Amino acid sequence: MLYTSMAHPFTHLALSALGLLAFLQASYAQDPLDRIPPDGQPWRIERPADVPPALAAALKQADCRQSEAMMVTFPIELFRPAGARPMAIVPCSGITLYGRAYVFERDGSLRALAFPVMPFPGRVNASEQAGVLAWNPDAKTLTALESNDVCEGTVTRHTYRYDERHGGDDLNGFALVKVERGKLGCNGASENWQVMWEN
């Protein structure tokens, strides 16, 4: 009888502990930014179902569409440059493929980034659609490749370098360092890039 009366409090305590553990795990899993590695390496998202809700809402508002097939080749990347807010680079389908970048603000909202682009030497504009974006965590560079729907058409590649001293600025620490132009061949990329501007 003593064993039975003692078993009930222990069972109740064990079930309470398991419930608390499940609650803590669920709370931890609810914040998708916790999945972003702290060392600049990207978290690649290859399925629309895995896109964090706040980002999915921002993409819908911007009419930035992805498909399952496109995301296998061009995944969404979430990364955290050292000393900066987490950010996302996203491919979008349209007449040509283009990209958008967002910074996750402290309150959980997203802010679209407008990058400096140089359509002509010496002329700088800001654009939220600088091109298809790629992050290199080792070099701490973000490249934007302007796509083209014409075979053998001229394309532009902008390179932005991350500087943690400017992690909280308008571009989340990125500055334009190089602009190149080249022609993409009908069968893929050519190695004919010419530097148009470099800082």
What would you call each of these model-derived segments?
Residues 6-8, 67, 95, 154, ...:
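General secretory precursor processing signal
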Residues 14-23:
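Bacterial N-terminal signal peptides
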Residues 96-100, 127-129, 152-157:
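Short, surface-exposed coil-to-beta transition loops
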Residues 111-147:
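An exposed acidic His-Trp-rich patch
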